[in-house]
Amino acid sequence: MKRAGTLRLLSDLSNFTGAARLRELLAGDPAILVRCSPDGRHLLLLRPPGSPAPQLLVAVRGPGLPLERAWSEGDPSPLDVFFVPWLARPALILVWESGLTEVWGVGMEPGWKLLQSTELCPDGGARVMAVAATRGRLVWCEERQPGVEDQPGQLSMAFNHCVCVKTLDTSGEAGTKLGCTHILLHHCPSFGLIASRKELFLVPTSTTWPGVAHVLLIWSPSKGKVIVAAPSLGLSHSKSLNPKQGDTWDFRTLLRGLPGFLSPREPLAVHTWAPSSQGLLLLDLKGKVSLVQCHGGTRTVGLLQEAPVGLQGSAALGTFHGTLACVLGSTLELLDMSSGRLLERKVLSTDRVHLLEPPAPGVKNEEDLETRGALRLLSALGLFCVCWEAPQGLEVPSDKDLVFEEACGYYQRRSLRGTQLTPEELRHNSMFRAPQALASILQGHLPPSALLTTLRAELRDYRSIEQLKAQLVAGDDEETGWTELAEHEVARLLRTHLTGDQLAQFNTIFQALPTAAWSATLQALQLQPDRSGRLRSQAPPDVWKKVLRAPTAGKEHPNGILPPFELLCQCLGQLEPQWLPPFVELAQQQGGPGWGAEGPSLPLYRRALSVLGEEGKRPEALELELLLGSGRPKAVLQAVRQLIKKEQWERALEAGLTLDSSSPLLRSEIFNLLLAEFAQHRRLDTHLPLLCRLCPPEVAPDELLLLLRTHLPDDAGATPFPEPGAEPGAEPPLTVGLVRALLEQTGAQGRSSGPVQSTFEDILWDSGTPPPTPPRGPMTTLQASDHPGQEAWGPSGQGLGAADVGVHS
């Protein structure tokens, strides 16, 4: 069913003070300036110069006194009047072309009173061309008289303006006070000023020099920068502009440093400018509506059915709920901002229609609860709102029904059952507590005291976050505020499933504020170093399960979005690379079976290496630490080979010695690698004691000699000294003296285990007692047989019998 845009009457203006005067002024001159206070209770009307009294009217809805001001023909009327934003009490600022500024406010006593009167241009000879108020600042563009250093001429007159800013102090019992002045831009053309809630737009006017009339500026006080944009050229450039740091710019110097901005181009043919929450709306003379975004980019929103008739016709632009509303004369057109499609076109009964800005966020307004976010129209007939209304016959589900329907889809995505979950099953099944608790809260059966006790912690966190947001909006200590907000958001995301949009937001925070994001992760995982330099964690397994969840096998990271573990490793590698290997080792201890994606997943050390760069371009020291700490045989052997290649012998030996008895094969493989190096050159001789400790206990001396023989170079000489014709600096060959320590190690291990296991054992060990000396005397038959002749070798049986007889005789 198609939704319908409706005009709903909010007030016939009878509840405003001075309703008759208010209707009279609204039905009169269409060029009247209309503004609304941030709380929506005050309406301000300023008539153009030369109009009959009163020229200024401030009407109040409900109790209160109106404000009427009139100026004689000799006294000019104010150039502009507006409410001070972000104030609990209403306050007005009146600015004249001469620079005279008055601040009016409502105190404890009824009625309006003058709080302050000051001059924006104390030197004289200057006049204010445009003025705006944004986020505690008063900004104006003033035309100055040419100085002595300025060359006379038309070009000098075109750039004799400057843009100034004055702080608005809204604290204390005295109300609003104007502070010190700072110049933002020197030698600039005439600019119009349009303020939104966050940015200030400096737009060209009909008197702007044609050569720069295609350029506009966007100043963001909270970010301390100005963006120079040329919508017709598609160019934008950012520069620092922070009054707190004393930043100021010469407009001509600023443009000369930006290539392409001074290209010949027609001035912007704009009929109407209007601020919005997304940027600045502009309507050209052909009926095309464009949006200049806060970063300087421009996009077309849509094309109106009819174009404005000249520059004199009245037009107003506004947005609500993704819809663009344009009042052109007595016609109201509604367009979809995403597609530009015309949604609805209405013909109004009057062409004296004014669009009002929506109330400030967080302001309580009982009449706007049902129409919150809707666009408001003001005419002599009353105050209306433009909103979308559901067609008749469409049944809107209750809040409790929406809770169970949303929970049904949530549980269905995570259910392992084949049957479809239904809202009725969630209502009556006691296993699903969360939707039932939320539905009970919405139903309101819990007493306020019990509900407050249940939600006290959540409300405290919510209040602190809202206070932090208000601090950021005010622009106070933004660096600390953004850091704290990032910590809150990371802690919240770690309580979710970290998939889809949550994972994308997790990546965005780490890219924008890596230090704050890692600090929040440190607290969530409860990471603490121990005395041995390792990391410990007291976080529950559910948190580690979310962090270590691997991506789906065979799929690349979409749009550069990294899984949580890869993102943490990347951040830690940039901030504190020395803690990355201990973090990966801790993650390997915390990881459990089935925590990866479907199918086999990569080991954690390889996932950490993947974010450090391609192979060959990674930091070598960090890669070695990750390989050695992985505990994987292939990774450890790869690290040992790299250490051998770099001739870091002691570290390679320590890598093998640190392995416990549960890895005998890996330790033996490392010993074989180092033994091969020991056999080929003499650069490992100084570390021979460590090599002996690394020798496996099951290696026998003959096996050791066979291994050494296998790895001996083919051109090794037979002597322990270089040949006479050998090249200088040649490696001496391996000698028995060097091998003796290894043979003694294997011999000692073999001797302590029992009987002799090798034929070389008697070479290394003697009994310490010589054999007994044979007796001296006549030689017996047995003794004669010790020196047998050829005739003495007879059959074995006969010889054995003769010897036996001789012994016992």
UniProtKB/Swiss-Prot annotation:
Gene Ontology molecular function: GTP-dependent protein binding; small GTPase binding
Cited function: May regulate the synthesis and function of lysosomes and of highly specialized organelles, such as melanosomes and platelet dense granules. Acts as a cargo adapter for the dynein-dynactin motor complex to mediate the transport of lysosomes from the cell periphery to the perinuclear region. Facilitates retrograde lysosomal trafficking by linking the motor complex to lysosomes, and perinuclear positioning of lysosomes is crucial for the delivery of endocytic cargos to lysosomes, for lysosome maturation and functioning.
GO biological process: blood coagulation; lipid homeostasis; lipid metabolic process; lysosome localization; pigmentation; protein localization to membrane; protein secretion
Record's compositionally biased regions (Polar residues): 747-760
Subcellular location: Microsome membrane; Cytoplasm, Cytosol; Early endosome membrane; Lysosome membrane
Chief location of this protein within or outside the cell: membrane
Keywords carried by this UniProt record: Cytoplasm, Endoplasmic reticulum, Endosome, Lysosome, Membrane, Microsome
Region of interest: Disordered: 747-809
Gene Ontology CC terms: BLOC-2 complex; cytosol; early endosome membrane; endoplasmic reticulum; lysosomal membrane
KW Endoplasmic reticulum (keyword) present: yes
Subunit text: Component of the biogenesis of lysosome-related organelles complex-2 (or BLOC2) composed of HPS3, HPS5 and HPS6. Interacts with HPS5 and HPS3. Interacts with biogenesis of lysosome-related organelles complex-1 (BLOC1). Interacts with AP-3 complex. Interacts with DCTN1 and dynein intermediate chain.
Signal peptide (residue range): none
Protein name: BLOC-2 complex member HPS6
